[in-house]
Amino acid sequence: MSVPADAPILTSRAMRDAEAACAASGTSLSELMDRAGAAVADTAWRMAAGAPVLILCGPGNNGGDGYVAARLLRERGANVRVAALAPPTTDLAKAARAKWAGAVEPIDETLAAEPVVVDALFGVGLTRPLASNLTGQLQALAFRRVIAVDVPSGVDADGKHDWVPPLPAHVTVALGALKPAHVLLPAAQHCGRVLLAGVGIACDATIRSLPRPRASAPGVTSHKFNRGMMLVRSGAMPGAAALAAAAGLRAGAGYAVLSGANTAPLSAIIVEDGANYRERLGDKRVGAVVIGPGYPAGMALDRDVASAIDSAKPLVLDAAAIDAALPRLRGGGVTAILTPHEGEFVRAFPGAEGGKLERALAAARATGSVVIY
């Protein structure tokens, strides 16, 4: 999966509000649909490279985008067919359908596929999984190059439900802004490469996609000390901590100390039995501390987490170390990076509500920390 960097991310409700605000400012919704359809047509034109295109249109405005794309592709001379699930039900989609002069085939078991399929069936308004009979019909078209309009049909745009689409996309054309489904697993794995089409909607988004991190190459005067020391505290199961130490080296740390283990996957990792862990925390060369991977809950972990917090070093907390640190994180004055998986998150933040974005934000605010979830 691939998404553009520094792009706005809006929930389906926020997207509808942005569209309404755009219309109130003087841009008609039909103009927005024309722009969306043009973006889809451009993508299909490039991907098809002269091959025939099949556009699947739903009854709503997502289908309207599909009818616009079909018309524009036909005007360019493309070999394009349209198949519809049902007649249009919105005024915008009806108007777009009326401008399409070609035939409209039914979506059933006799529908023949083309090398490129545009999925304009259901967009951000989907509130339930697709019907099983439609799923079966669409799965027969899945072994093609699929372009999804906004989100693959069958995906929950807000990423709250783990619905599996029958037509996973190779490319998804996100309209106006990214949606949570484009960046959150498992939905994101069905979106393929995400292209953001700016259709003229002003997006006052407080959530944006991050650019890929760029690590600078070591300079001629670089050495292990000025590139930073990483201290990883290991528990009774050192495998995960050893992997964290190895990842730190690969990410650019000058060197890594694995405290509390007797082996490491890389010879470059310094292995210590952990007896001098607190002394290591006082080492001015230590630029970051990682604690929690493979470290079971208990008094030993509680003590080691408390020592790490007291050191005031930049801190990464994982697994049971998150639980051990929660009282002090919630008390303020302590900042960390928290890396829980789903089960660890639910255990640490059982009252968090909403989708994944809302829950992660609530956890970050409650702890004053960065939450990678």
Where does each model-flagged region fall?
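N-terminal beta-loop-helix "entrance" segment that forms/cooperates
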Residues: 90-99, 264-268
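A glycine-rich helix N-cap at a beta->alpha junction
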Residues: 74-87, 97-107
